[in-house]
């Protein structure tokens, strides 16, 4: 069917005829999921004869994750229900609506059984979404059916947002009954001392600061270190009585590793020697000032060194061991990029983010937690945008690992070029949550930070970088723009700290 090799299992979806070119291109990022953690699997995607064709070697049924322009919500990855491979095409928009209604209904039922108070506004939205979906099924015209299904999908997303708000309100209320102000860290990464005039504002918004100390920025050439800005930033944070952490020391990306290290492709032993030397040097320098370290980030799904996944797990463990050799009392955390496992849709990867983390934790090393990157709306390091319900579910998945989880946040406030951002990272291709504007960034920051902070297993939430005027990863992702003006997101985070945290 559709010219796919016979060894592949195939399903197809009829695509609306009026879909924009960019939305059609994003459909090629779709994937079929599998496994107990419902992570994406290697999926071949094609658009032919008005159909999205998905093929893979594994013939088991599974949900399909599809980037889709959801009315009033943005361009978001949206799940279907579990679908089987078959010759007859599915109706794409109808399956997305069915999948979202099902996802919201199931999560609502789970939380109700766990003690969540019924929410009439959620009930009403689900009823409306179901009614509109039923109307779509009865339409004889394919175009009319698509319009109705799209509206059902939009209403289901609104129901999901209402459900998350009800869940957050009740969880915060219960937690504040025991503790008026929570101990959770809310911080921002600082590559240098904050700009003049920001000192007091920073301390009002955040109770913590994280210094990246990333290998590429500190030791750009072998044995030649740039300590001045890092020393000043660490001393500034210590003098302000902020909780001081650092990392990621080893970021497995072209923007995180020095050029002389990137040349060691396929040489894990040579890489390990240089890596451990760097970790020992940095940890020794800041011993007594920094007690919590994000030792690595982005090892899962990384191919920059042409090193296999098992070697990357071993290298993460070796980096941690090098730090513990300096101080066995250190709290060490390792980071996970693309927590939904977007990279698994490409061939060459087997370990989902959850399996990668679980494997490391089962090694017996006393890690103090894991960090999950919620860098949404950028590509290739970031994840394609999800809604709050999808974010809550993936965070709860990592919560079952039994160690504290910290969350790193980043979302762009604009879509154009950013001279100081990682040249490999772009807003194009990452979807969008409502929009890529300063106002949308502020709403995103408040919504996603609040969701993370309400979870009892979350130990800290950190914004990716403070200012767009210095080198950074997420394009336009700072809380201060390149001209030195505070963005609205800064005040939204300050309000969260004031309401909920010490």
Task: Write out the residue ranges for each language-model feature.
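Short, acidic/polar
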Residues: 190-203, 230, 272-283, 347-360, ...
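Boundary/entry segment of secreted carbohydrate-active catalytic domains
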Residues: 3-27, 171-208, 212
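Aromatic- and acid-rich polysaccharide-binding/catalytic face
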Residues: 203-216, 221, 286-297, 301, ...
């Amino acid at each position: 069917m559709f010219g796919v090799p016979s060894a592949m299992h195939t399903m197809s979806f009829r695509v609306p005829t009026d879909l924009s070119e960019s939305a059609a291109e994003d459909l090629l990022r779709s994937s079929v999921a599998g496994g107990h953690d419902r992570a994406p699997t290697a999926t071949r995607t094609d658009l032919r004869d008005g159909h999205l064709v998905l093929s893979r070697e594994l013939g088991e049924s599974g949900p399909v994750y599809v980037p889709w322009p959801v009315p009033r919500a943005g361009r978001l990855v949206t799940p279907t229900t579990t679908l089987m491979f078959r010759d007859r095409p599915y109706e794409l928009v109808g399956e997305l609506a069915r999948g979202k209604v099902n996802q919201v209904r199931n999560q609502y039922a789970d939380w109700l059984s766990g003690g969540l108070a019924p929410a009439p506004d959620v009930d009403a939205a689900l009823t409306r979404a179901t009614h509109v979906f039923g109307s779509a099924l009865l339409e004889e015209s394919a175009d009319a059916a698509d319009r109705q299904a799209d509206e059902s999908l939009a209403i289901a997303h609104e129901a999901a947002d209402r459900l998350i708000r009800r869940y957050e309100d009740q969880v915060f209320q219960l937690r504040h009954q025991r503790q008026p102000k929570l101990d959770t860290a809310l911080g921002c990464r600082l590559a240098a001392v904050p700009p003049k005039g920001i000192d007091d504002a920073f301390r009002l918004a955040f109770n913590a600061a994280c210094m990246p100390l990333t290998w590429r920025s500190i030791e750009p050439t072998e044995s030649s270190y740039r300590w001045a800005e890092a020393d000043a930033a660490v001393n500034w944070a210590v003098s302000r009585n902020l909780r001081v952490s650092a990392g990621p020391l080893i970021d497995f990306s072209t923007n995180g590793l020095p050029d002389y290290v990137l040349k060691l492709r396929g040489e894990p032993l040579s890489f390990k020697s240089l890596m451990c030397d760097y970790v020992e040097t940095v940890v020794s320098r800041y011993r007594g000032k920094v007690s919590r370290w994000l030792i690595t980030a982005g090892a899962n799904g990384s191919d920059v060194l042409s090193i296999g996944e098992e070697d990357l797990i071993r290298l993460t463990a070796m980096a941690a061991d090098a730090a513990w050799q300096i101080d066995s009392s250190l709290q060490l955390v390792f980071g996970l990029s693309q927590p939904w496992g977007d990279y698994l849709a490409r061939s060459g990867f087997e370990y989902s983010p959850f399996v990668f983390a679980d494997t490391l934790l089962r090694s017996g090393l006393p890690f103090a937690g894991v960090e999950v990157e919620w860098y949404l709306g950028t590509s290739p390091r970031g994840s394609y945008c999800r809604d709050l319900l999808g974010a809550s579910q993936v965070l709860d998945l990592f919560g079952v690992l039994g160690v504290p989880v910290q969350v790193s946040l980043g979302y762009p406030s604009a879509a154009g070029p950013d001279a100081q951002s990682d040249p490999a990272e772009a807003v194009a291709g990452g979807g969008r949550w409502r929009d890529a504007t300063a106002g949308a960034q502020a709403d995103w920051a408040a919504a996603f930070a609040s969701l993370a902070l309400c979870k009892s297993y979350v130990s800290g939430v950190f914004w990716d970088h403070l200012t767009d005027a210095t080198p950074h990863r997420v394009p336009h992702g700072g809380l201060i723009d390149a001209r030195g003006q505070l963005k609205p997101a800064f005040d939204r985070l300050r309000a969260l700290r004031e309401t909920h945290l010490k």
